[in-house]
């Protein structure tokens, strides 16, 4: 594909200001800078990757004058909140915030003549078809000192896969699944036995993997989403799963990673080829460690069934709301220690008659187990001013459960989270403090992105925060704003997110971390909250494998890019 030079020139005025430079930090070359490669240089590079260079625009650009396409605009409007559609667009992200940035405008339902800014969507992207494309792209970025980002599906809560004036490597189209009856990592000693596994190319998405796993008769410990990439940031961030109680986090199941390094070389990383690098990849976060091309995971036996428990507690008097929230918080540790994994939301606003909703699941659980475990929920429902209770459903496998309950929430919104892992002690002894925080910030949608006692047998062998060992849930507070919100309104919401992070840290203890894939992009104590005492080791590994700091992203190990509220 040849990109007309006049198209580039016309687009340049639409750019937001170049990537921020920080005093004393490494200034990278962004679109609009004098150091940005000339058009003929880009065209020469494009010829080496079979025309896979894409001039990238925000998802709504097809509905505005410069890039207007009536047919494409109609599809975009129809499928604007469809996560399957958005992951197939080079310039689309799950959150509009990471397309438009602080001041950008390019909205889907505004008149054709309205302005459409570049925002923080990368200026150029390489739609990688294989390892060679990625090797060439990394070397090109290194040669020209470009601001380089890596994008898979764009499900990124921390804004790590976009950047103003950046050059992007897009791995979404790397597809392929290979199921192994007996897999041995490269370099493993002869006495190491092979185990069942699956090798997933970077672009594979969770729902497709679940469908294939069902056909293979195995279980894959992926996340609670449909379109999230199974072999990208989900894994490097830890990867909480509905099966984490039994099989741990996604990183605990990783046997091997194939990637392209900062030197533009393809490598296979596992516990035998490079133990430190393998440690960093399993929980070190974001794209700080290279461009992942495939991941090999353990697989597990298929359960006989999936039992689901759903509880809903409604209030008929407002005085009951605090009581319901506090008592359910205190009940959660026993439920998850009995092997149930769940997701729940609280409502503190007076207009909502439902105080608490939660869904749990457990493979192979019996009805007797359900009745005993959820008895506290039914007891809460008998309190004055409270109705509801818990019910159970059974599905033949996880795929059938997925068809009924798996969704991709908050698509095409501006939602950001503030979160912390919480222990049994916090849930039982500091429940009232958590309730007070919920009522202090009633519009933040408090809830649990996961309720799970994680199997942490591998915790010391991965970079994931050690507080997962004692956690029983991930409590989260979310803020959002309308696309057309004022700059003042946006800043207020972001500051609220940062404030809640601080308050949560005070309640749970500053030594307690969070799940970095669902953390605040403005987390003030990010090194400690994401990795704790593991950060020093990670930084040392980062300096060895990426001495020029080519791979950078917001609040990633060794980064000099720190987004501020």
UniProtKB/Swiss-Prot annotation:
Keywords: FAD, Flavoprotein, Glycoprotein, Oxidoreductase, Secreted, Signal. It comes from the Eukaryota. Residues 1-21 form the signal peptide. Disulfide bonds: none annotated. Belongs to the oxygen-dependent FAD-linked oxidoreductase family. Residues 118-302 form the FAD-binding PCMH-type domain. Its EC number is 1.-.-.-. This is Uncharacterized FAD-linked oxidoreductase ARB_02478. InterPro entries: BBE, FAD-bd_PCMH, FAD-bd_PCMH-like_sf, FAD-bd_PCMH_sub2, FAD-linked_Oxidoreductases_BP, Oxid_FAD_bind_N. Glycans are attached at residues 46, 88, 191, 314, 364, 371, 484. The lineage of its organism: Eukaryota, Fungi, Dikarya, Ascomycota, Pezizomycotina. It is found in: Secreted.
């Amino acid at each position: 594909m040849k990109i007309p030079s006049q198209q580039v020139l016309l687009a340049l005025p639409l750019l937001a200001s170049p990537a921020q430079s920080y005093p004393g930090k490494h200034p990278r070359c962004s679109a609009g800078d004098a150091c940005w490669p000339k058009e003929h240089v880009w065209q020469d590079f494009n010829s080496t990757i079979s025309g896979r260079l894409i001039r990238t625009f925000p998802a709504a650009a097809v509905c505005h004058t410069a890039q207007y396409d009536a047919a494409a605009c109609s599809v975009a409007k129809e499928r604007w909140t469809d996560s399957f559609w958005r992951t197939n667009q080079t310039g689309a992200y799950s959150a509009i915030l990471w397309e438009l940035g602080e001041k950008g405008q390019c909205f889907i339902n505004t008149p054709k003549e309205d302005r459409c800014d570049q925002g923080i969507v990368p200026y150029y992207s390489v739609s990688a078809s294989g390892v060679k494309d990625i090797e060439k792209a990394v070397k090109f970025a290194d040669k020209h000192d470009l601001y380089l980002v890596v994008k898979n599906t764009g499900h990124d809560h921390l804004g790590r896969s976009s950047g103003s004036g950046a050059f992007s490597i897009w791995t979404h189209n790397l597809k392929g699944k290979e199921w192994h009856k007996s897999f041995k990592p490269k370099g493993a000693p002869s006495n190491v036995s092979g185990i069942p596994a699956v090798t997933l190319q970077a672009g594979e998405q969770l729902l497709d993997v679940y469908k294939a796993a069902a056909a293979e008769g195995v279980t894959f410990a992926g996340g609670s989403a449909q379109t999230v990439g199974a072999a990208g940031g989900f894994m490097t961030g830890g990867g909480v799963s509905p099966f984490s109680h039994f099989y741990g986090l996604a990183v605990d199941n990783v046997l091997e990673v194939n990637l392209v390094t900062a030197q533009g070389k393809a490598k296979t990383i596992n516990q035998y080829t490079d133990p430190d690098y393998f440690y960093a990849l399993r929980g070190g976060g974001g794209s700080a460690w290279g461009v992942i091309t495939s991941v090999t995971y353990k697989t597990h036996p298929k359960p006989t069934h999936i039992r689901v428990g759903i509880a809903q507690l409604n209030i008929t008097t407002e005085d009951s709301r605090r009581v319901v929230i506090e008592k359910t918080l205190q009940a959660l540790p026993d439920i998850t220690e009995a092997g149930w994994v769940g997701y729940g939301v609280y409502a503190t606003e007076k207009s909502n008659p439902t105080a608490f909703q939660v869904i749990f699941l457990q493979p192979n659980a019996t009805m007797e187990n359900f009745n005993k475990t959820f008895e506290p929920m039914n007891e809460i429902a008998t309190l004055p001013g409270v109705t509801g209770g818990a019910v159970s459903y059974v599905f033949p496998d996880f795929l059938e459960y997925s068809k009924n309950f798996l969704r991709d929430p908050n698509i095409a919104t501006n939602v950001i989270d503030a979160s912390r892992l919480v222990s049994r002690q916090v849930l039982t002894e500091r429940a009232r403090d958590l309730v007070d925080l919920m009522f202090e910030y009633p519009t933040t949608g408090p809830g649990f992105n996961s309720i799970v006692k994680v199997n942490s047998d591998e915790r010391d062998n991965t970079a994931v925060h050690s507080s997962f060992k004692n956690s029983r849930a991930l409590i989260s507070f979310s803020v959002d704003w309308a696309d057309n919100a004022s700059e003042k309104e946006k800043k207020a919401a972001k500051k609220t997110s940062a404030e809640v992070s601080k308050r949560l840290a005070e309640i749970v203890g500053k030594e307690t971390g969070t799940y970095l894939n669902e953390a605040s992009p403005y987390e003030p104590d990010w090194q400690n909250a994401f990795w704790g005492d593991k950060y020093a080791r990670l930084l040392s590994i980062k300096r060895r494998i990426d001495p020029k700091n080519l791979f950078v992203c917001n609040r990633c190990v060794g980064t000099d890019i720190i987004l501020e509220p």
